Regions:
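Short cytosolic juxtamembrane segments of multi-pass membrane proteins
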Residues: 193-197, 203-204, 260-265
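Secretory targeting signals
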Residues: 27-80, 109-182, 186, 226-246
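Membrane-helix interface segments
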Residues: 16-17, 99-101, 105, 194-199
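Helix-loop-helix units of permease transmembrane domains in multi-pass membrane transporters
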Residues: 81-113
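Central hydrophobic cores of alpha-helical transmembrane segments
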Residues: 21-26, 196-209
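Alpha-helical transmembrane segments of multi-pass membrane transporters/translocases
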Residues: 15-17, 21-24, 178, 228-265
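Aromatic- and glycine-rich beta-strand/loop motifs that create alpha-glucan
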Residues: 1-25
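Juxtamembrane non-transmembrane "cap" segments at the membrane-aqueous interface
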Residues: 134-149, 204-220
Length: 265
């Protein structure tokens, strides 16, 4: 399986989708820094990292755009290639050299990793950039331009003691869910009519699920709100774990059942 993983990574890092998604995410991050600096240039010396990082900056549309587009950023790099492999006949060729289960494991691993790093890199770059410009001290609770993280919020202890660690915790969480969302494309690839559909379905699912949860359950199981570090909705660690574990088990079961199919296309 290692040769398959190596080759899949080779394909992934040569994918146009990877660089398009990375460029889009980074552009949003840079745009947020520029917008904040231009809006508050007269009082810039009083601002701190947690007011300016895209994850906790609620002043501009860049935060909402990034987290709304997160499934697209996750799926663009490599998630649609399983559909492509089926349609081009590449899957038939690779199954001459490895088992179907081995192929699925390799493909899923690379899809997950590429999705995670594509979402995490812009957030990390933005964090490193604002840390070179603004001090790391924490704003007072409910201070102007502060995200207003309270004791009931997730990772509130980190927010109060070290904003960089708070940001890193959410970046890792975002990377985990980005990987899971990208794997949805792999799960549905055999039942869609185009590579575009395979890439867009995780986004559609993400938006619909989050919208329904916001309307019926105060947003406490809205994935979009759960991944956003500004935390406009209060949720617990247990809810995050349930969503992550539940999503992981469903995807693993789906891929396991696909891998058990007879190696005949």
């Amino acid at each position: 399986m290692k040769p398959v993983i190596k080759f899949e990574f080779y394909r992934a890092f040569r994918s146009v989708g990877f660089y398009v998604a990375l460029l889009l995410g980074t552009a949003l991050a840079i745009g947020d820094i520029v917008l904040f600096h231009n809006a508050f240039r007269d009082t810039i010396d009083t601002k701190v990292v947690m007011q300016t990082w895209i994850g906790t900056d609620y002043q501009f549309v860049t935060n909402s755009l990034f987290y709304a587009l997160l499934p697209i950023l996750a799926a663009l790099p490599y998630a649609g290639t399983y559909y492509e492999d089926i349609k081009t006949g590449y899957l038939k060729n690779i199954l001459l050299h490895t088992s179907r289960r081995g192929y699925y494991m390799a493909k899923s691993f690379v899809v997950f990793v590429m999705a995670a790093i594509t979402v995490m890199i812009p957030l990390l770059l933005d964090l490193m950039a604002v840390m070179t410009i603004y001090p790391l001290r924490m704003p007072e609770r409910l201070e102007f331009l502060s995200a207003g993280i309270l004791d009931v919020n997730l990772f509130s202890g980190l927010y109060e003691t070290n904003g960089a660690l708070y940001a890193l915790a959410f970046i890792l969480l975002d990377g985990l869910f980005a990987g899971l969302l990208a794997l949805v494309s792999v799960c549905v690839a055999e039942r869609v009519e185009s590579m575009f559909s395979a890439i867009v379905i995780p986004f559609a699912f993400y938006i619909m699920w989050s919208t329904v949860m916001m309307e019926n359950n105060d947003g406490r199981f809205s994935v979009m709100e759960m991944l956003n570090p500004r935390q406009s909705v209060v949720f617990s660690r247990l809810q995050v774990v349930l969503m992550a574990v539940g999503g992981t088990l469903v995807i693993i079961l789906w891929l396991f059942l696909k891998g058990r199919r007879k190696d005949v296309l």
